[in-house]
Amino acid sequence: MGSSSLLSFSLCLLLLCHLSQAQFGSSQESPFQSPRRSVSSRNECRIERLNALEPTRTVRSEAGVTDYFDEDNEQFRCAGVSTIRRVIEPRGLLLPSMSNAPRLVYIVQGRGIVGLVMPGCPETFQSFQRSEREEGERHRWSRDEHQKVYQFQEGDVLAVPNGFAYWCYNNGENPVVAITVLDTSNDANQLDRSHRQFLLAGRQEQGRQRYGREGSIKENILRGFSTELLAAAFGVNMELARKLQCRDDTRGEIVRAENGLQVLRPSGMEEEEREEGRSINGFEETYCSMKIKQNIGDPRRADVFNPRGGRITTLNSEKLPILRFIQMSAERVVLYRNAMVSPHWNINAHSIMYCTGGRGRVEVADDRGETVFDGELRQGQLLIVPQNFAMLERAGSEGFQLVSIKTSDRAMVSTIVGKTSALRGMPVEVLMNSYRLSRDEARRVKLTRGDEVAIFTPRRESRAEA
């Protein structure tokens, strides 16, 4: 009897471990693989020329603007992603919706609050109305329960799995600017390779193409049900059911909350303390309490720092475990005037680079050794660099800041020159014979950059150091 109980317990524990690994990814997976990428995208990367991209379609709402990049562009088809930029005005509410693809959202500017509804998780936040103005209704609406609400600020990365309801609100004094990259080639998306947004509220015009026809109207999903059955499902009358369908709502997907949005949320200090005290071993951080954001704009979080060159901050699934679930990661690069990033390539991911400030010169080379991009990337522009394409970036006189969203949760980079680089790891005689160099020349190629890693100071400063 005792051995039977022990066997049952062991089987249950084994099943739990298996499900945990299936849900969030096994820690033993090779970092060189991107197992949740669609194979169909591999035939669409025969690109002869890359271009700096800007939005091609704009949709205006009551309290903001949504800009869409052309997902049919060959660069987006190669990477298997779709990209959106939103500007949310103060007191603007991005209405609840969900998408067919997982996404990463980078906050370029502003602050606010965001809600991500985890299916099946309890409403753990309870708020009570205490204002005298509402005291008369206290007994009718004394308490509201909802899932956790997060505060976000400039430099935050938000991870949103596909199919999860998501909303955000600008409670600051300045517009919120956010760039969103959706991985439409992720195996979690079992529809087509296009981004599909499913509105839970409101209705939205599809917008006007910068060079093309006007779009149609997108209704929310409740509009697709009959009013009668919808009323029965919610247990409300027909009039209220019609309001849920937003038949005459012309405000768009970003609406203005005239009286603000009063929801319960932890203070920034409380939220930070809670996150610092939480283990990330995959068992103690449960599905319902999973952390969905982290800041990569704070200089104190930099992984690479050069006091005269700049800094690089990476965010992967080791730091934010939910990224293992959506198979994406992010990188923030800040270059000072005339500084450079070492020539490098992405080993296991495509890179969607968005310039958040300044400007810089970028060069990209393909597998034939051809230059597929040689130009300037300015604030608000986007460049997609396919996997293994080599790139080189140099800041202009204003500096150069960019964020890269990558299609692997543990994206890896190989630098060509500098400390820990490909050439640094080769014997001098290999370099001599490969490039027909003298021994002295080979040593200079290998060692001139000294201990600089990934970010190089302007050349004249390097000479001064020497």
Curated annotation (Swiss-Prot):
Which pairs are disulfide-linked?
C45-C78, C121-C288
Known SMART domains for this protein? Answer: Cupin_1
Expression across tissues: Endosperm of the seeds.
Q: Which UniProt keywords apply?
A: Disulfide bond, Seed storage protein, Signal, Storage protein
Q: Give TM regions.
A: none
Q: Name one GO biological process term.
A: seed development
Q: Name one GO cellular component term.
A: extraorganismal space
Task: Show where the Cupin type-1 domain sits.
Answer: 50-242, 294-443
Identify the stretch annotated as signal peptide in this record: 1-22
One short Pfam name that applies is Cupin_1
Return one GO MF term.
nutrient reservoir activity
Q: How does it assemble?
A: Hexamer; each subunit is composed of an acidic and a basic chain derived from a single precursor and linked by a disulfide bond.
Which family, according to UniProt? Belongs to the 11S seed storage protein (globulins) family.
Its biological purpose: Seed storage protein.
Q: Which PANTHER family would you find in this protein's record?
A: 12S SEED STORAGE PROTEIN CRB, OS03G0336100 PROTEIN-RELATED
Protein name per the record: Cocosin 1
